[in-house]
């Protein structure tokens, strides 16, 4: 009985093992597990794509809002400049009327009144410009940058006006 040697029994064991694997539907379970994993990966990819698109939409929206804010800031600055020009023109007109009405006064009093009027106009223009700059900086910069820029601007305004 040569066919009853160890090789034969190993072969029979292999055949029985393979039959058991097929009987227990292991290949089907493996295929189902792989299909489930593929579905999970597909769902994760779809979710990632959806999140990316949502992020793109948010980015576009925030860029639009930033542009609107910049345009509004530019409008505010332009309005402040126009108002400063009007105030300057109005102050100049008042100063000229004051000087014309007071020609009988001495030359020293006229010069003193002009100096005071110019300082008042400059002070009002500086206050308006600083307020506009504060508004713009409050919208655009963080606290540290705002503080630094404000300090520099005030120093420059003081040196130029004095």
Swiss-Prot record:
InterPro entries: ATP_synth_b/b'su_bac/chlpt, ATP_synthase_B_chain. One of its GO terms (molecular function) is proton-transporting ATPase activity, rotational mechanism. It comes from the Bacteria. One of its GO terms (cellular component) is plasma membrane. Its main location: membrane. The chain crosses the membrane at residues 3-23. It is found in: Cell inner membrane. Keywords: ATP synthesis, Cell inner membrane, Cell membrane, CF(0), Hydrogen ion transport, Ion transport, Membrane, Transmembrane, Transmembrane helix, Transport. The keyword Cell membrane applies. It is a single-pass membrane protein. PANTHER family: ATP SYNTHASE SUBUNIT B, ATP SYNTHASE SUBUNIT B', CHLOROPLASTIC. F-type ATPases have 2 components, F(1) - the catalytic core - and F(0) - the membrane proton channel. F(1) has five subunits: alpha(3), beta(3), gamma(1), delta(1), epsilon(1). F(0) has three main subunits: a(1), b(2) and c(10-14). The alpha and beta chains form an alternating ring which encloses part of the gamma chain. F(1) is attached to F(0) by a central stalk formed by the gamma and epsilon chains, while a peripheral stalk is formed by the delta and b chains. Belongs to the ATPase B chain family. F(1)F(0) ATP synthase produces ATP from ADP in the presence of a proton or sodium gradient. F-type ATPases consist of two structural domains, F(1) containing the extramembraneous catalytic core and F(0) containing the membrane proton channel, linked together by a central stalk and a peripheral stalk. During catalysis, ATP synthesis in the catalytic domain of F(1) is coupled via a rotary mechanism of the central stalk subunits to proton translocation. This is ATP synthase subunit b 1. It comes from Rhizobium johnstonii (strain DSM 114642 / LMG 32736 / 3841) (Rhizobium leguminosarum bv. viciae). The lineage of its organism: Bacteria, Pseudomonadati, Pseudomonadota, Alphaproteobacteria, Hyphomicrobiales.
